[in-house]
């Protein structure tokens, strides 16, 4: 049996930023004159699994896709939802129907107009039967979404339609206050009608067509993803950075050293041991902000014994979350629910044992472990699969130690490169 650690993101966003260190080209205005930033070099922690917005599922891809595409709506720096390709929208009084009016100035990078049909096509692609999208569930508020993806309804019954070239209508089966936020995510991005047939369309600049502030200029896996400003972007006049480069550096210390050497302008993978020293060394450059994200362990429920609820409860109870975030040491918060704290308007359920003492929690973990049929004479044995990178290794080693110490479980650690991790995790 196997369980795996998600590598999508952590509960707290963390970065070092030194925009003044960006490469600005030749100084044509003499010494002492501040030059505009024309390029940006970012550490990305790894290569994207894909740049197909319908199939992307990792933070490495999401970082790049936000530059390559623009959704109907987008997020402002303060987290609020603001117009994107849609100039405005109306929501019916019952909260079930959204009507979006698209800007006629929105163009694809090849010059074609971005239409309501392109957005409808992207959403239908995600929810088509047999879809491999890991984030299709985010679109389940759409009318008949579950029925369509499970082949119980035809795709034309899905709650999305283009009324005309510049008007998109979306219908929900029940009100969903968060739905506008979903539409800012890659899973709801438009798809050009020439894309989607082959994977190379999303990896080769010769085929790639996007509608964002940047175009794909080069992708050398394991080396760099280079983007160039899209002159046809609807708001190109306000895009001052001409080139953005993403470097897939797996080792966080290597990435930090590149940042310190001036070879990167942003790094978001600070090694745990360096967090406090860096806050003292570069207080103006360390940025910490809440992030709508979760670091979690995914279980393979298709086979025994991980399909036994009592065993899953034992594994969860055995984790000392307070200790875990202390070991990781980058300002994360313990996660006691699926939705992180701080989400506006959300008051989620919490474990009833959240405030137990460590001894009480471990006692309940052992009780659940015994009730699941395991003990010292019959210990649980399983494999924990995790992505490369010292954060993930730290978490994996800590979890394995906790399960062994509290329950007596025997854990085999299996570290895999990110792409191989994606290909072999099912």
For each of these PLM feature ranges, what is it?
Residues 36-49, 87, 97-100, 119-122, ...:
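Short, well-ordered beta-strand elements
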Residues 87-135, 169, 258, 305:
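Aromatic- and charge-enriched surface segment that lines or borders ligand/interaction sites
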Residues 217-228, 245-303, 326:
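Extracellular/periplasmic solute-recognition and catalytic clefts
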Residues 25, 367-426:
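Ligand/substrate-recognition segments at binding pockets and active sites
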Residues 333-372, 389-394:
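Structural transition elements
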Residues 115-122, 165-171, 212-213, 241-243, ...:
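Alpha-helical secondary-structure segments
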Residues 43-93, 124, 131, 207-210:
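N-terminal lobe/hinge region of extracytoplasmic solute-binding protein
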Residues 143-145, 151-156, 161, 166, ...:
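Gly/Pro-rich hinge or "lid" segments in bacterial periplasmic/extracellular proteins
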């Amino acid at each position: 049996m196997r369980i795996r650690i998600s590598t999508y993101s952590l509960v707290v966003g963390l970065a070092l930023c030194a925009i003044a260190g960006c490469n600005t080209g030749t100084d044509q205005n003499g010494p002492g004159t501040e030059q505009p930033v024309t390029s940006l070099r970012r550490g990305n922690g790894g290569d994207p699994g894909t740049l197909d917005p319908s199939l992307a599922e990792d933070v490495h891809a999401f970082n790049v896709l936000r530059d390559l595409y623009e959704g109907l709506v987008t997020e402002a720096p303060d987290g609020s939802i603001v117009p994107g390709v849609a100039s405005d929208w109306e929501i019916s009084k019952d909260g079930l129907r959204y009507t979006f009016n698209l800007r006629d100035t929105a163009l694809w990078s090849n010059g074609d107009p971005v239409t309501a049909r392109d957005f409808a096509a992207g959403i239908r692609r995600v929810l088509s039967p047999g879809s491999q999208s890991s984030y299709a569930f985010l679109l389940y508020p759409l009318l008949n979404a579950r029925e369509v993806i499970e082949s119980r309804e035809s795709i034309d019954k899905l709650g999305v339609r283009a009324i005309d070239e510049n008007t998109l209508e979306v219908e929900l089966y029940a009100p969903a206050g968060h739905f506008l936020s979903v539409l800012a995510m890659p899973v709801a991005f438009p798809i050009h009608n020439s894309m989607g047939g082959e994977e190379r369309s999303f990896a080769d600049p010769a085929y790639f067509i996007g509608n964002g502030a940047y175009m794909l200029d080069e992708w050398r896996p394991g080396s760099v993803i280079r983007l160039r400003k899209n002159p046809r972007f609807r708001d190109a006049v306000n895009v001052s950075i001409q080139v953005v480069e993403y470097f897939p550096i797996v080792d966080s210390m290597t990435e930090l050293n590149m940042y310190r050497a001036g070879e990167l302008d942003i790094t978001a993978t600070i090694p745990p041991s360096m967090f406090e020293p860096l806050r003292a060394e570069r207080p103006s450059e360390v940025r910490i902000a809440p992030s709508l994200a979760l670091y979690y362990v995914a279980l393979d429920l298709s086979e025994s014994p991980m399909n036994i609820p009592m065993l899953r409860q034992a594994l969860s109870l055995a984790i000392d979350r307070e200790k875990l975030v202390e070991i990781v040491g980058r300002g994360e918060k313990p996660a006691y629910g699926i939705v992180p704290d701080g989400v506006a308007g959300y008051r989620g359920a919490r474990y009833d044992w959240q405030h137990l003492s460590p001894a009480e929690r471990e006692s309940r973990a052992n009780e659940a472990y015994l009730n699941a049929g395991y003990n010292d004479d019959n210990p649980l044995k399983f494999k924990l699969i995790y992505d490369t990178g010292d954060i993930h290794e730290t978490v994996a080693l800590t979890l394995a130690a906790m399960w062994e110490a509290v329950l007596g479980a025997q854990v085999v650690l299996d570290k895999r490169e990110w792409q191989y991790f994606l290909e072999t995790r099912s």
